[in-house]
């Protein structure tokens, strides 16, 4: 346990030391959520996004406030999510089922791990030029597009490249 505390302290100190003061987006972030491997990630320029890419997203309002008020993510912190759909693709939620371009991609849950009801959106939409859909399909407990739907592409602050994770 002491070894883990030392590693976490070193990662935190490294992150602060490498964080450019003039930049509002971090160069490195620590992910503590289990929806992707826990660990240190370096952020790279976005450029053109691809489906399945792991990105850091700054939640837009009112999502950011919802996440903070309900204890999912402190205000101002980015979340790591996989890009599941890009502009021009069709994303649907019918009941709990998430479908992208007629392919079932996963299920939403009714309640979170604490038993609280989760947000629900329904219907189909073709993503606009400025929208993406993010979902960590490998994690059934991830709070992602299953619950909040598409988000602005401008919410992406960088590609997340693993530096060190608990799965290495």
Model-predicted regions and their roles:
Residues 75-107:
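Mid-length scaffold segments of soluble, non-membrane domains
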Residues 1-78, 126, 148-168:
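Protein maturation boundaries and topogenic segments
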Residues 46, 60, 96, 103, ...:
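Surface loops and adjacent helix of pleckstrin homology
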């Amino acid at each position: 346990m002491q070894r883990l505390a030392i590693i976490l302290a070193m990662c935190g100190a490294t992150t602060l030391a490498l964080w450019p003061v003039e930049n509002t987006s971090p160069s490195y972030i620590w992910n503590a959520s289990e929806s992707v491997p826990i660990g240190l990630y370096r952020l790279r320029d976005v450029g053109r996004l691809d489906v399945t890419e792991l990105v850091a997203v700054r939640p837009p309002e009112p999502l950011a406030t919802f996440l903070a008020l309900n204890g999912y993510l402190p205000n101002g912190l980015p979340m790591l999510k996989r890009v599941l759909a890009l502009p021009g693709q069709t994303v649907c939620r019918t009941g709990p089922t998430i479908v992208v371009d007629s392919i079932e991609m996963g299920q939403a849950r009714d309640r979170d791990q604490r038993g609280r009801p989760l947000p629900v959106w329904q219907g189909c939409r073709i993503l606009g030029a400025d929208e993406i859909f993010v979902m960590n399909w490998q994690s059934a407990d991830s709070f992602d597009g299953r619950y909040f739907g598409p988000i602005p592409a401008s919410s992406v602050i960088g590609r997340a490249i693993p530096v060190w994770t608990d799965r290495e």
